[in-house]
Amino acid sequence: MPKREDINKILVLGSGPIIIGQAAEFDYSGTQACLSLKELGYQTVLINSNPATIMTDTDIADKVYIEPLTLQFVSQILRKELPDAILPTLGGQQGLNMAMELSEAGILDELGIELLGTKLDAIDQAEDRERFRALMNDLNEPVPDSGIATTVEEAVSFADQSGYPVIVRPAFTMGGTGGGIAQDEAELRKITANGLTLSPVTQVLIEQSIAGLKEIEFEVMRDSVDNAIVVCNMENFDPVGIHTGDSIVYAPVQTLTDREVQMLRDASLSIIRALKIEGGCNVQLALDPAQDRYYVIEVNPRVSRSSALASKATGYPIAKVAAKIAVGLTLDEILNPVTGTTLAEFEPALDYVVCKIPRWPFDKFVRADRRLGTQMKATGEVMAVGRNVEEATQKAIRSLDIDINYIGDEELADLNEADLVDGIIHARDDRIFYLYEAIKRGYSVDKLADLTKINVYYLDKLLHIYEIEQELIATPFNADVLELAKKNGFSDEVIGKMWKTNEKEVRAYREQMGLSPVYKMIDTCAGEFESQTPYYYSTYELENESIVSNRKSIVVLGSGPIRIGQGVEFDYATVHSIQAIRQMGYEAIVVNNNPETVSTDFSMSDKLYFEPLTVEDVMNVIDLEKPEGVIVQFGGQTAINLAEPLAERGIKIFGTTVENVNRAEDRDEFNKLIQANGIRQPQGRTATTTSGAIEAAESIGYPVLVRPSYVLGGRAMEIVHAKEELENYMKNAVKVSHNHPVLVDQYLVGKECEVDVISDGENVVIPGIMEHIERSGVHSGDSMTVYPAQTLSQKVQDEIVKVSIKLAQSLECIGLMNIQFVVHNDEAYVIEVNPRASRTVPIMSKVTDLPMARLATRAILGESLVNQGLKPGLHPAGEIIHVKAPVFSFTKLDNVDSLLGPEMKSTGEVMGSDRTMAKALYKAFEGAKMHMPDHGKVLITVKDEDKGEAIDFARRFWELGYQLVATKGTAQTLAAHGLKVETVGKMTEENNIVDRIHDHRIQMVINTISDSTTSAADGIKIRSTALTYGVPLFTALDTVDAILQVLESQAFTTLHL
């Protein structure tokens, strides 16, 4: 069937902010879909609330709306744009749920708008647990024994009959949100209550546990004439019971027989056909090889996280093909863009092994519960490609950008036996390291398989790595053993440790032996057809498939996996840099390892190397390609950290020099620069010991802000009020040394603001000044931000511009730089300078209409800003007010305190834009899913120093018609100022705060911490309960002021005579 001519305008629903379970993969799929539809000649309209994505760039769709993905705003845009159709299946769970909501509200019928791709009934059938179970029974597809519950008591009743353990799976959620495995009634009650709250239809499936079986995924495609194919099959390293987003995954499947693969393939195709899904679909199955049977776990009737992985693993562009299927094209009409010759109906073939390992946020949240289950906890993932499981796994581990770059974690050597076994049985994010340690200690693979239900095949691979390790230790500088090690993924650095030498010596010996990697192409067809893809991975074989052109090339280093502090914003900057390089006539070569992102779409660059971001792996690419140089400033701290070692090896680093980057990041050097220019900054000192830190704090005066040097996202940063707190911080939060000092700064209370700077080494352009709503002490990534600045005096703004220009020129900045200020007593103090792209680049590029990363790249490559049409100084601001709001994933992580502070905790962001501050704030809160009730009870429980401000806020809530509830101390303060307030009991008393939140007798919580340990523990419990039950929670008083501005702008004044 040719493409449909009866539709012209198509609206694409985006996926909203990045949260755990819904990350950058939807930026990738949404971008692909929009470009695909434009290519076919359709007019496209996009709605997405996330300003950090490539998808919301104005050139991706014909019209882009960065607006809240709520019924109110989407309906308004639909009535204005009147599209012929909506495509919801590329916007994750958010897109599907929005489509269902629009249909139920009658908007689609009212406006005569058609839903493209998978039909609503199919979505409902796949997502509604009861209907899905009924369909599987009709198809004779086996599902675990299960029951539907809409109350906690119904869940308990099913479990009483079936026995424990049971798995709880909420309907219409993603990332396993609200789910879990319950071992007993108490756990079941807790998980079900949470699951019912988080399910938009208040429904959960209670399922007999099949934990321990093999978990297999099939990524399938179907078109409107019932052609259906399998794009990719994948096997989870971890058995059923751990969310696939938290599991190590291999493609293609490694341990299944041909018969088993065929059995599961037939089931997957039968299901997609029965659901009549048009586009991409992910089928998850559990296989019990011992009984020769399987179960269907669930189906995602949309493009998913696994689709992005399958696309990158195979080279098959699932989202692009799905968009074309949605407008009527069939698989036998769509050309495969990888080969340029085969059609999309050909199933990809893989002649390599792909390994995906999740990236978890536990380096940020050290107190979080690291145990893995059916609710996803990872923020991102890495992918590595090799010729065998060992090579792919080892490359994936060193792609994670964690402190461990080898499967043999030296710190586990001192672990006692009981803790080792516990770490093996109770799966955590680091279980693979525990398994390897157990193998080193002589545990048999059969014993480990019995303890974990992980297939012996994979444990054998770990044993093989250990055997090679032993050979390396026994025979240093042996060419045959070295070749064996390299073919199995060992890095030069790790081999150096085993040979008691260093990475450079190993590299020199390897090159002397003529041992260098070759690059193989990912081409969807295992080399069967001629391919056009410039998409490569390294391995140690003979034939190199990456042909070096005679064009001048530039290597751009990506930012690796999505994590807190280094999110999709850096991928945005990377993609813009690639575009500028290509526009200037250079060949753009990307090195990155994140399967979720736009930068690793092979069509974005001239060449893509899917490799770990380490010195060795990057140098191997450079040795082959011989580029003009490398750009590091768009890849976050991951890429910046590679600048110095690459420069030491004679590689040209484009942009700000390594020496000037170090001047900005080294505290003593930076202090000298600040003083030489007469710039204000909070007093600060460095310390390399605990006693040195205490001495520094006492000379500056408490409170102080302490942090390690060279960090991103405020890792291990705290505000410390007393000596005991500082001693505890030094002991538990940082590893301090002469090479890694701790920074101790005066903590100034004031308003924070920040600027991004573009410089060509001479001219300096400041796109705008962003003002933070929360006062200093809250990490910039977690603060609400407004542009243009609303409350800064002209004097302060002028000072910020002057200081920013002076700093950029003094640091000889070429490219981008970010500067953060605190305004104290109407004076601007510099608190931080980051000589690289920051996480504010996407949002500022959009609100100022200055493509900052593109402009910066052109400056880096020698084109002056003036020649690019820019006027030096502060770029004039428009009339529209833009508010960025952070978005958090606290409901996914147990034991993580939601109190905001100097350590970054948000996973994503949204933007609200309008002509007034109150309207922009309202949109930002709505986009962040912080919907405010217009009446009810507000709980106020604050520390002593906040009580003065709390009185004013309480009065404003009271005047709006809200009732006030407070704990004893706060209640007395409010009552003394003439406010009617109800006193509520503390945690140990009856009718306490937590009970009331649990019973929905509190509609909003304002809670700031007290430093005393009992109150601190109470505060954590109050906050976590509010989050669990979906009650709006505020832990910073400035955010309360912002929400009051919104509520007051919507309220009418009622006057009595």
UniProtKB/Swiss-Prot annotation:
Residues 402-546 are annotated as: Oligomerization domain. ATP 1 binds at residues 129, 169, 175-176, 208, 210, 215, 241-243, 284, 298. Its EC number is 6.3.4.16, 6.3.5.5. Mn(2+) 1 binds at residues 284, 298. Mn(2+) 2 binds at residues 298, 300. Mn(2+) 3 binds at residues 820, 832. The keyword Nucleotide-binding applies. Mg(2+) 2 binds at residues 298, 300. Mg(2+) 1 binds at residues 284, 298. Keywords: Amino-acid biosynthesis, Arginine biosynthesis, ATP-binding, Ligase, Magnesium, Manganese, Metal-binding, Nucleotide-binding, Pyrimidine biosynthesis, Repeat. Residues 547-929 are annotated as: Carbamoyl phosphate synthetic domain. ATP 2 binds at residues 707, 746, 748, 752, 777-780, 820, 832. Pathway: Amino-acid biosynthesis; L-arginine biosynthesis; carbamoyl phosphate from bicarbonate: step 1/1; Pyrimidine metabolism; UMP biosynthesis via de novo pathway; (S)-dihydroorotate from bicarbonate: step 1/3. One of its GO terms (molecular function) is carbamoyl-phosphate synthase (ammonia) activity. Mg(2+) 3 binds at residues 820, 832. It catalyses: hydrogencarbonate + L-glutamine + 2 ATP + H2O = carbamoyl phosphate + L-glutamate + 2 ADP + phosphate + 2 H(+). It comes from the Bacteria. GO terms for biological process: 'de novo' UMP biosynthetic process; glutamine metabolic process; L-arginine biosynthetic process. Belongs to the CarB family. Large subunit of the glutamine-dependent carbamoyl phosphate synthetase (CPSase). CPSase catalyzes the formation of carbamoyl phosphate from the ammonia moiety of glutamine, carbonate, and phosphate donated by ATP, constituting the first step of 2 biosynthetic pathways, one leading to arginine and/or urea and the other to pyrimidine nucleotides. This is Carbamoyl phosphate synthase large chain.
